[in-house]
């Protein structure tokens, strides 16, 4: 009879412990109910990129001296630089410059080592297309500056929505 009583006591302790664990889990669940949602509605709300965000590369044709430093420092030799040597002025003349963003790893080496600062990183990260050949940008496409997420009036940024909720 004595082992039977201790068995009932152990069962009671285990039941109380299980109820305590369930209660703790329920309290954690209730504490999350007061928090703001973490997910964003992507096409309508966008995160503001950080200052050093490495997005699409912007290229300024007039500044480029066709030195090909960007090609040498690129880990995958990606930028295609076509130039012609002008004998009368004894300098290279840039003919064509292109980058295939389907292959680019956005490391930023080309921007960092460019001696004339003709390359820069933008905050544009929406490069999806239906055809991968559309990701090959020439100097004209690389020269276009993207619209800033902050300046776009059709998009509510997460920073603005948080400021509205706190007011």
From Swiss-Prot:
Catalytic activity: a plastoquinone + NADH + (n+1) H(+)(in) = a plastoquinol + NAD(+) + n H(+)(out); a plastoquinone + NADPH + (n+1) H(+)(in) = a plastoquinol + NADP(+) + n H(+)(out)
GO cellular component: chloroplast thylakoid membrane
Cofactor needs: [4Fe-4S] cluster
Cellular localisation: Plastid, Chloroplast thylakoid membrane
EC number, UniProt record: 7.1.1.-
Coiled coil, from the record: none
Membrane-topology descriptor: Peripheral membrane protein
Keyword 4Fe-4S: yes
Enzyme class of the recorded protein, top EC level: translocase
Single annotated GO MF: NADH dehydrogenase (ubiquinone) activity
Domain called 4Fe-4S ferredoxin-type: residue spans: 55-84, 95-124
Binding residues for [4Fe-4S] cluster 1: 64, 67, 70, 114
GO biological process, one term: photosynthesis, light reaction
Keyword Iron included in the entry's annotation: yes
Parts of the chain that traverse the membrane: none
Keywords, in A-Z order: 4Fe-4S, Chloroplast, Iron, Iron-sulfur, Membrane, Metal-binding, NAD, NADP, Plastid, Plastoquinone, Quinone, Repeat, Thylakoid, Translocase
InterPro entries linked: 4Fe4S_Fe-S-bd, 4Fe4S_Fe_S_CS, NADH_quinone_OxRdtase_chainI, NDHI
Cofactor remark: Binds 2 [4Fe-4S] clusters per subunit.
Matches recorded under HAMAP family: NDH1_NuoI
Annotated family: Belongs to the complex I 23 kDa subunit family.
Subunit composition and interactions: NDH is composed of at least 16 different subunits, 5 of which are encoded in the nucleus.
NCBIfam families: ndhI (TIGR00403), NuoI (TIGR01971), PRK05888.1-3 (NF004537)
Primary role: NDH shuttles electrons from NAD(P)H:plastoquinone, via FMN and iron-sulfur (Fe-S) centers, to quinones in the photosynthetic chain and possibly in a chloroplast respiratory chain. The immediate electron acceptor for the enzyme in this species is believed to be plastoquinone. Couples the redox reaction to proton translocation, and thus conserves the redox energy in a proton gradient.
Protein name as it appears in the record: NAD(P)H-quinone oxidoreductase subunit I, chloroplastic
Organism: Gossypium hirsutum
Gene symbol of the encoding locus: ndhI
């Amino acid at each position: 009879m004595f082992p039977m009583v201790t068995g009932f006591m152990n069962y009671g302790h285990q039941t109380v412990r299980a109820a305590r664990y369930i209660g703790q889990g329920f309290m954690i669940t209730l504490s999350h109910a007061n928090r703001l949602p973490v997910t964003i509605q992507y096409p309508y709300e966008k995160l503001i990129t950080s200052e050093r965000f490495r997005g699409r590369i912007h290229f300024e044709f007039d500044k480029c001296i066709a030195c090909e430093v960007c090609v040498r420092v690129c880990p995958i030799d990606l930028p295609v630089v076509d130039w012609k040597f002008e004998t009368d002025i004894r300098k290279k003349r840039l003919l064509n410059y292109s980058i295939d963003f389907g292959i680019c790893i956005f490391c930023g080496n080309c921007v960092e080592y460019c001696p004339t600062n003709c390359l820069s990183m933008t905050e544009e990260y929406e490069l999806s297309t239906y055809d991968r050949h559309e990701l090959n940008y020439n100097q004209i496409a690389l020269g276009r500056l993207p619209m800033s997420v902050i300046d776009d009036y059709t998009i509510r940024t997460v920073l603005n929505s948080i400021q509205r909720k706190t007011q």
